[in-house]
Amino acid sequence: MLAGILAVVVLAGVWFVALRSVPVPVNGQELSVRIGTPLETFLADNDYFGATPGRLMSVGGNVIDERGGNPCAVVRDGQELTTDEIAATAMGDGDTYTVSNGTDAVEPYTEEEVTIPPAVQKERGGAVQYVKQWGQAGHKTVLHGERSGETADAEGAVPATDMIIGSINLKPEGGPYVALTFDDGPSRYTPDILAILADRGVHATFFCLGNQVASNQSEAKAIVDGGHEIASHTQSHQNLPTLERDSLRSEISTAFDNIEQATGVRTQMIRAPYGAFTEQEWGRAGDIVGCNVLWNVDTHDWERPGAQAIADTVLNNVRNGSIVLMHDGGGNREQTVEALPLIIDGLHDRGYQIVTVGELIELDGRIPQAVVGNAVSMPEDAALPA
């Protein structure tokens, strides 16, 4: 009888210990909880104490699902529990809990590595244009959201370094200096111009058309043999901004090839027809062009205003470092031939030394020597914008 009573007492004690209620602090509020209560059940019965899951966000930062993010955060005795740990936890004496809102989550996404091409910045107002800073490509990671269909750039993108085109008017020291230049040849007028230059012991720069060089190779060779500078006016005098990339590069490089074949000189110097060489053209062909040479004094000799008018235009407008534009081809150039002695003699009377464009650039000293030497080369780590 006594043994039976003792057994009942022991069972009652075990039952009391195992199923008794204990105080459990939750978010600073003390609640009575039966020992062994599943934590997951306890949280659900109390609606997670007002805490809510985080939002599910798109890669672009828009809300896809207000409750589709990370679940409510549950911390026991300073340690955050995982979802599996919450499901496996039975509440016990001495536990302390904190329940808070879940954090936002980003939708599933795929990643794409993208190259960022450099842009072109072009200085204005100068007669000589050249690559002052080579561009370098950047890169970024693009996220493609699987639910939203949105795309967004990930953090940590490396920006591109822009290509910078310098543009300066030449200001040589020790002058005054001036460069005489001729476009659109060689032609039947070129020998007369060369003879005048030789007679007066001066050198000029000839911006030749590649197709004219191909059909007048002896005249092109005579330019170089006379100690003059030969450069390119492109192959066929097209408006370069209207050309697609491959056509543009061909228009430039074919002229270089024809000049080299006729004279042995591989130039990188051009004068774009109409002076039109924009950021777009530099971005497409800056690796094959050393410099684009414009002018400071336009004689308008192609309008045939008379030899004296052509000469007066030069003498009334020339300054130290000026580049003078004339033509030895592209039409009737008799007035240019007639004006040339007047120009040379007038410049000499005013103390000017007549040099080539390359010499003028070198005397100025601000443009890299590789430009003068037709040795410009794009660095291996550089990139063109297009």
Range-by-range predicted roles:
Residues 2-15:
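Hydrophobic membrane-insertion alpha-helices, especially the h-region
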Residues 12-31:
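Eukaryote-biased recognition of intrinsically disordered, low-complexity regulatory segments
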Residues 27-41:
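Short, contiguous acidic and Ser/Thr-rich linear segments
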Residues 37-77:
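LysM (lysin motif) carbohydrate-binding repeats in extracellular/periplasmic proteins that recognize
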Residues 61-71, 76, 84-179, 188-191, ...:
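N-terminal pre-catalytic segment of deacetylase/amide-hydrolase enzymes
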Residues 79, 102-104, 185, 211, ...:
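Solvent-exposed coil/turn segments that connect beta secondary-structure elements
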Residues 150-239, 243, 247-251, 256-258:
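Active-site beta->alpha N-cap acidic-glycine motif
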Residues 192, 238-353, 357-373:
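Catalytic domains of cell-wall/extracellular-matrix polysaccharide-remodeling enzymes
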